[in-house]
């Protein structure tokens, strides 16, 4: 009986070691350029670029299958950052994919909401809370302002409310110039 247990323990250890070695040996690395591009994109998952989310768009840019100017939520600033990262000239935002809008969040008029759950199904970031035939509400901190919840609503109880520019949402609008650290040598 103990022999069978020791055989099973030995097999488990051997298989574990083989699996561990295989995981290290055959590890698939993601595209590091796509990772950097994805970090620049606004993560609204809105699909305005023609891709189902920011990650697929980043991968398409990295492969050269998409242009850098297809993201309206990222605006001109996003295009400039992508151009700088990729070492290409910035392009004007492609208006075929939409125009930049002020940052906003969805708001559900809970008196009008019929609880159909269509908005919940449409939200790519799960920023809508509610149940069938119950009123729904937006989790404002999670909402990216993608507007994907507007179209499926049969009673038009969802509206977009611009985010006020207060301290947590304020952003420096002027270009930031990187300063050299004291003592850093300059190249000639």
Swiss-Prot record:
Stretches for region Hydrophobic: 1-23
UniProt-listed Enzyme Commission number(s): 7.-.-.-
A single GO BP: electron transport chain
Binding site for [4Fe-4S] cluster 2: 113, 116, 119, 153
SUPFAM superfamilies: 4Fe-4S ferredoxins (SSF54862)
Domain 4Fe-4S ferredoxin-type, residue spans: 104-133, 134-163
Residue sites binding [4Fe-4S] cluster 3 per the record: 123, 143, 146, 149
PROSITE patterns: 4FE4S (PS51656), 4FE4S_FER_1 (PS00198), 4FE4S_FER_2 (PS51379)
One of the Pfam families matching this protein, by short name: FeS
Cofactor binding comment, as recorded: Binds 3 [4Fe-4S] clusters.
Keyword DNA damage: no
Cofactor or coenzyme needed: [4Fe-4S] cluster
Keyword annotations: 4Fe-4S, Cell inner membrane, Cell membrane, Electron transport, Iron, Iron-sulfur, Membrane, Metal-binding, Repeat, Translocase, Transport
Residues the entry annotates as binding [4Fe-4S] cluster 1: 46, 49, 54, 71
Positions of the 4Fe-4S domain: 29-88
Keyword Cell membrane part of the UniProt annotation: yes
EC primary class: translocase
Principal cellular location given in the protein's record: membrane
GO cellular component, one term: plasma membrane
HAMAP family: RsxB_RnfB
Family of this protein: Belongs to the 4Fe4S bacterial-type ferredoxin family. RnfB subfamily.
Functional note: Part of a membrane-bound complex that couples electron transfer with translocation of ions across the membrane.
Record text on subunit structure and interactions: The complex is composed of six subunits: RnfA, RnfB, RnfC, RnfD, RnfE and RnfG.
Designated name of the protein: Ion-translocating oxidoreductase complex subunit B
Organism: Thiobacillus denitrificans (strain ATCC 25259 / T1)
The gene coding this protein: rnfB
């Amino acid at each position: 009986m103990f022999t069978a247990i020791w055989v099973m323990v030995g097999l488990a250890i051997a298989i574990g070691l083989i699996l561990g070695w295989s995981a290290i040996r055959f590890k698939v690395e993601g595209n590091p350029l796509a990772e950097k591009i994805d970090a620049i994109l606004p993560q609204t998952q809105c699909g305005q670029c023609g891709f189902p989310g920011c990650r697929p768009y980043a991968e398409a840019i990295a492969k050269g299958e998409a242009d850098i100017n297809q993201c309206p939520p990222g605006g001109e600033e996003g295009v400039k950052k992508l151009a700088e990262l990729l070492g290409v000239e910035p392009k004007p935002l492609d208006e075929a994919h939409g125009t930049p809008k002020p940052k906003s969040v969805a708001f559900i008029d809970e008196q009008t909401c019929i609880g159909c759950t269509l908005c919940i199904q449409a939200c790519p970031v799960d920023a809508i809370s509610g149940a069938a035939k119950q009123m729904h509400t937006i989790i404002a901190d999670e909402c990216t302002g993608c507007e994907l919840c507007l179209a499926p609503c049969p009673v038009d109880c969802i509206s977009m409310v611009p985010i006020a520019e207060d301290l947590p949402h304020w952003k420096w609008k002027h270009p930031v110039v990187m300063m050299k650290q004291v003592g850093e040598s300059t190249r000639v």
